[in-house]
Amino acid sequence: MNVKETPPDNYFKCVKVSLKHVLKHYEIIQPKINQTVIKAHKIIIHTLQFMKLYLLDYYDTHKTLPKIDKMFINCCMKILCKEKSIGRPPKKEIKELKDKLTNFYNTHYKPLCQDEELDYTYMNNILNYLTNDIVTMYENNIKLHYIEYVERYVNVMWEKKFMTKQIRKIKKTKKDRDSTISKLNNQLRKVKNDVLNIEDTNFKSYSYYHSWIKEQKKFIIPTKKKFRKNNLYYDLQCNPQDYLQCMIYMMKQVEKRGYSTNNPFPMRNDIIPKHIRLDTATLVHLLLTKNYGKKNDYLYKGNLKKNENKIWKFFFRTERQCFTKKWYSFHHMIETDGVSCSILLLRKDKVGKRIRINKIPNKEKYINELKDYTDIQDKKIVAIDPGKCDLIFCVDGDNKNAKKFRYSQDRRRKETKSKKYGKLLLEKKQETIIKYETELSMYNRKSLDIKIFKEYCKKKNKINSELFSFYFQELFRKLKLNGYWNRLRSEQKMINQFKKIFGNEKETIICFGDYEQKKHMKYKEPIKGRGMRTLFRKNGYQTYLIDEFRTSCKCSKCGGGSCEKFMIRENPKPFRNNLRLVHGLLSCKNCANVWNRDCNGATNIYKIAYNSIHNIERPSYLCRNTSDILDDMSKSQFTRPETVKPCSIKCS
């Protein structure tokens, strides 16, 4: 009896290929698409600059902000472009808004621009998609960074940096310094929690801070009668724009004190053209010529939907394999930057139906949160310790015979050719381009002072006009596409090797340490964290999280001995002439065993996973005691991934 296959969970699928691979009459059509990409790119650059200038001026005048909706952004885009004399007249409210924006543009922004006319002929649909993107940019920036702004504001107002320096000067022993700095951090953490807490007026911080907290809440938390579910964090996700003016206020205060600021306004600083979205109507407007018939024959009376397959076949090789996948069919929409092309596919059973997309991502489960282990008890356990140098270090046991596998950052760099491409681009830039970019770096794009930001805009627009011809070369976009393909190739090669060593997805489950990097570390290349777990899930593996508390610093062989760095060597950085301890090599104080740090961590993760699956208590030397739980609880509930780690409740 054949088992009926179930369709995949994802409604949409994206396939990225070269535009040349799918476009017919490439020499004729590609220049038209490329020109549209460049026009859209210029419009976005100017729109984001103009919006920041207008919103700053509006805030300084009214101490509030207008609603940043699709109508407002679309009007901003169109007043920056050459006005069309044809078409139906706009609605009254749109005309009034456009007049207001035009007056501001002529007075404040036009003098900062070069003599260049923008136009959006046949680009109405493209502008609508870009409008949605800008709304998303603003709202995502607020949702992700508002809490960070509050924390930075508190640190600056209470001079955390200065106080820390003074403590380091005054206190003579390392123990005293660390203890005093820790107390200061705990005090400020309580202040931040009190500021962000709208449910409880009983402040947890010292009474010394209470009057300041009450005063500042008026400015850094929106003034509203009711927060959704009486919770600031939930309300932030529902109504992000309510928090933008608070972010502006905080960063203005930080800037007044001479500190570097974050930018509450999204900007496009990169000059290399980005992707635009093309749908069937845009194809008809942009590319359809008299050879294919009259445009009106396709645009009206429902003919656009009826003939969409025919229209796409005029210009694209839709018979190619990339347009049809198992379970999926072409959704008649692509994104392109003139060189690469991302084809959007829709699940066949959802074609013509209204699609409800679940915006809440699936929460990753900790292994000890599962209620039933019967399905996975017979499967092989692979423990993975994620890190910086070894992106993943895998083991399938806690003894000498355990199989090991690692995927390193050096290997990824080599296979993706990122270093090679970086050098190639640097050679291409030569001295003139670097000189221009160095000159621009002297101006502050993040400033919330209108005069300073105007100076930046003027210089940026001038340098852009000089550098457009250089950065619009196809080489930059080709290297970006090649980098994407190389990353896919490297990751698939790694997955294939993993399968050979540890078995396929039906035989194996994977337990990841819950390492989470909230911010990018200086001087380190970007790494895949959550993305690595997603990669294994997409390849069919069941993945679970493990609380990796003490997994690296406790010996997995003797069960609890402290592992410490012991080997000293010269610092590999040529500009530092000191000796340093080797980070990746540890020695156990108890049994004198020498460990690779990642191997020790992965082995401890394996022990925790094995115990959880077989209903055995977590090893005691890897448990949190009461003070550890309290320390974890004292951290901001808005920045921690979990309120309490699952293992802490089980082992306390």
For each feature predicted by the language model, list its residue ranges.
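Positively charged, helix-rich recognition surfaces that bind polyanionic ligands
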Residues: 1-652
